[in-house]
UniProtKB/Swiss-Prot annotation:
Lineage, opening ranks: Archaea, Thermoproteota, Thermoprotei, Sulfolobales, Sulfolobaceae
UniProt keyword Protein biosynthesis, yes or no: no
GO molecular function, one term: nucleotidyltransferase activity
Chief site of localization: cytoplasm
Composition-biased stretches (Acidic residues): 7-31
Paired cysteines (S-S): none
Protein name according to UniProt: DNA-directed RNA polymerase subunit Rpo13
Organism of provenance: Saccharolobus shibatae (strain ATCC 51178 / DSM 5389 / JCM 8931 / NBRC 15437 / B12) (Sulfolobus shibatae)
């Protein structure tokens, strides 16, 4: 024990390092994945059910393909509305900021 630390202190230091590494990993993983809306989760569940039915032989490949395409079309409609709504809200926020800076 040249460092002057007891083995307990060394263990605590190691645990602190492990905890900080875990936090970094959690933060990194949270940044990598986009937030999912309820509609996104519902789409994932529908697609999972289609795969399950296909693998169990309850539906044909053609039927599964049609269902996936229908789900995708519905998703595209929702996604385009969401993007349009986001763009409109950003424009409103920018104009409000400009008005405040002109007044101030």
């Amino acid at each position: 024990m040249v460092s002057g630390m007891s083995t307990e202190e060394e263990k605590e230091g190691t645990n602190d390092e492990e905890v900080s590494e875990e936090r970094e990993v959690e933060e990194t993983s949270e940044e990598e994945f986009p937030k999912l809306s309820i509609q996104d989760i519902e789409l994932l569940m529908k697609n999972t059910e289609i795969w399950d039915n296909l693998l169990n032989g309850k539906i044909s490949v053609d039927e599964a393909k049609r269902l996936f395409e229908d789900n995708y079309k519905d998703y595209e409609k929702r996604d385009s509305r969401r993007k349009a709504k986001k763009a409109a809200s950003k424009k409103v926020k920018k104009t409000k900021k400009k008005e405040k800076s002109v007044e101030g």
